[in-house]
Design a protein with these regions (language model features):
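Iron-associated oxidoreductase/ferritin-like identity signal
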Residues: 1-204
Length: 204
């Protein structure tokens, strides 16, 4: 029961709970944020791009919730105490921090006056900050799901990678269409996403 993970980690029950709970919550947060951004944006192309991305986040959140373990008090994994941190938790922490940063950048719903600049910032945060970190998380979870019993979670990860990669490429292409041509680093990220490799994380 090994793969290319040098640490030999695999999905114990607690690790599966931590990952599916964390990812489901982050997908839910992203569904809400992207949904708000899509309606608040003042550029039609941004609205048209972010609305389906929001829907994809919501669908993945629902799929991940099916893996939450039954615990005393119900199935709400978020109510269960977190286990000790492991080396595999890094991508989840990076993703949570990215969502916090995005929320701070654009402000809570109803407290920001949206302009074209704000709309472009929302699309930029989606393409260059949020989606690349989801890709990293799903690739890490796919690596951990290396036991025969993990087939269902591997399938969820494969579907999520396909959706998220497509959203990443679409959002980046829309940035270019709206006049923000990707530099070499963004082109490199697009190519890596298409090849199934980890997109690089650039300074924001």
């Amino acid at each position: 029961m090994t793969n290319d993970d040098p640490g030999g980690h695999h999905l114990s029950g607690d690790l599966l709970a931590a990952w599916t709970t964390g990812l489901a919550w982050d997908e839910h947060r992203s569904w809400a944020m992207a949904g708000h951004w899509s309606t608040a944006a003042t550029i039609d192309g941004v609205t048209a791009t972010l609305a389906p991305i929001s829907a994809h986040h919501g669908r993945r959140a629902d799929q991940l919730r099916t893996f939450w373990p039954q615990r005393r008090g119900g199935t709400d994994g978020a109510a269960s105490p977190a286990g000790p941190p492991t080396p595999d938790d890094g991508p989840l922490l990076d993703l949570a921090n990215a969502l916090d940063e995005a929320q701070r950048s654009l402000g809570p719903p109803g407290e920001t006056t949206w302009t074209g600049t704000t709309s472009m910032a929302a699309l930029r945060l989606t393409a260059q900050l949020i989606l690349p970190r989801f890709l990293t998380c799903y690739k890490q979870l796919l690596k951990l799901a290396n036991a025969p019993s993990d087939a269902s979670i591997r399938r969820i990860c494969e579907l999520a990678l396909t959706d998220t990669t497509a959203d990443f490429v679409t959002a980046t292409a829309k940035l270019a269409a709206l006049g923000e041509n990707p530099g070499p680093s963004q082109i490199d990220d697009i190519q890596h996403a298409g090849m199934g490799q980890n997109p690089t994380h650039r300074p924001k």
